[in-house]
Amino acid sequence: MNKKETRHQLIRSLISETTIHTQQELQERLQKNGITITQATLSRDMKELNLVKVTSGNDTHYEALAISQTRWEHRLRFYMEDALVMLKIVQHQIILKTLPGLAQSFGSILDAMQIPEIVATVCGDDTCLIVCEDNEQAKACYETLSHYTPPFFFSNK
């Protein structure tokens, strides 16, 4: 994991396990865990993690706002229409080829959707390797992903 991923994981953990009232409080807790960052970086991280301030009674604190499954599906369909180059099964894996620079976005969306057949995604710049448990799981996953492709995608095959 890189520094940002490690920091994000710690922030998610702190938000879910403790009540954090302010950005300064979160920044101090990060520092106690050996991570020193600026307020601007923390603010960007909080936005990327969909952290929102909520009020319950007289208390305000931060929580992670979950993105709905429907929204992730819409996002996947949008990416498939605009950036999918190839979708192919290779034994218990699926190769998803994208326009340059977009494979990690596909991987993040697929991870967030928690498709049961997907064991892991490994993404580079323009290729996302989707690993499934076995060949049957890969076929089922391929069928699921095919529903998000534009109608014309498989017309030449």
UniProtKB/Swiss-Prot annotation:
Keywords: Amino-acid biosynthesis, Arginine biosynthesis, Cytoplasm, DNA-binding, Repressor, Transcription, Transcription regulation. The keyword Repeat does not apply. Its main location: cytoplasm. GO terms for molecular function: arginine binding; DNA binding; DNA-binding transcription factor activity. It is found in: Cytoplasm. SUPFAM superfamilies: C-terminal domain of arginine repressor (SSF55252), Winged helix' DNA-binding domain (SSF46785). GO terms for cellular component: cytoplasm. One of its GO terms (biological process) is protein complex oligomerization. InterPro entries: Arg_repress, Arg_repress_C, Arg_repress_C_sf, Arg_repress_DNA-bd, WH-like_DNA-bd_sf, WH_DNA-bd_sf. Pathway: Amino-acid biosynthesis; L-arginine biosynthesis [regulation]. Belongs to the ArgR family. Regulates arginine biosynthesis genes. This is Arginine repressor.
